[in-house]
């Protein structure tokens, strides 16, 4: 159960569609569920505002399906699965068929249960990537941000090799609440954007590039050493982590505790 699930449950109690005793039973669900191969954190959504996310790499389709079912049984209506390849997604969907609908986005390797919510953020998140080869990471970031209730503008293939492509979107950048800047090779895009905007920039180095890019390490070090003051950096290819952080920022209220 996450914050939006809890709000909906309380709303249902208020309008009489759910009995208070039934609501209490759902809220008092044990904070963990032991599946043998996984210990699910069922209270994370109440503590942090967003429920547990499933990292699909390294898990079997059977394990992923079992986790999804357990999360749903505990009241978490929306579930996100990252790093899920197409074959495993198809098998997971078969296991859930007739019970839970699994939406899959191949180019982002993301699976969604419960669909996309209406936007609730303070402003817009811009996801900008340097090249078409960065699109899988960019789409992971963009879809994750939308999953957490944010409006997203996509600026793709706007790398520094053709700076005019980025500058053509100066208005969108100026209106952003947060920018996620994604680039491989030398990773210069984040610093350039950081020098153009007044909002936080979250840089994502990607593993795109030739030999001396060292699988994204060159871009990572360049972004960490950015001279633009508002740039922070997440791990290589971590579009999900960047989007989660951007969503937290976009849902902050002045003087309010951090909550989504």
Language-model-detected regions and their locations in the chain:
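Short glycine/serine/threonine-rich phosphate/pyrophosphate-binding segments
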Residues: 62-64, 134-139, 163-164, 183-192, ...
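Long amphipathic alpha-helical segments
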Residues: 1-85, 89-95
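Short, acidic/small-residue loops that bind anionic groups at enzyme active sites
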Residues: 101-105, 193-216
């Amino acid at each position: 159960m996450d914050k939006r699930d809890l709000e909906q449950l309380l709303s249902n109690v208020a309008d009489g569609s759910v009995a208070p005793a039934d609501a209490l039973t759902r809220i008092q669900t044990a904070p963990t569920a032991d599946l043998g191969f996984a210990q699910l954190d069922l209270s994370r959504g109440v503590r942090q505002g967003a429920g547990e996310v499933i990292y699909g790499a390294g898990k079997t389709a059977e394990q992923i399906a079992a986790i999804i079912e357990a999360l749903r049984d505990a009241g978490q209506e929306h579930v996100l699965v990252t790093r899920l390849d197409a074959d495993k997604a198809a098998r997971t969907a078969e296991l859930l068929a007739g019970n839970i609908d699994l939406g899959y986005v191949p180019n982002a390797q993301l699976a969604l249960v419960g669909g996309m919510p209406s936007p609730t953020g303070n402003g817009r998140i811009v996801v900008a990537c340097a090249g078409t080869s960065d699109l899988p990471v960019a789409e992971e970031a963009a879809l994750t941000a939308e999953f957490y209730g944010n409006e997203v503008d996509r600026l793709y293939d706007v790398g520094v090799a053709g700076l005019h492509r980025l500058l053509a979107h100066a208005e969108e950048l100026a209106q952003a609440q947060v920018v996620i800047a994604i680039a491989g090779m030398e990773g210069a895009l984040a610093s350039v954007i950081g020098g153009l905007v007044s909002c936080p920039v979250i840089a994502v180095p990607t593993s795109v590039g030739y030999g001396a890019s060292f699988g994204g390490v060159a871009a990572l070090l360049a972004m960490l050493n950015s001279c633009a003051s508002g740039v922070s950096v997440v791990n290589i290819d971590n579009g999900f982590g960047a989007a989660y952080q951007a969503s937290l920022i976009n849902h902050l209220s002045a003087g309010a505790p951090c909550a989504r």
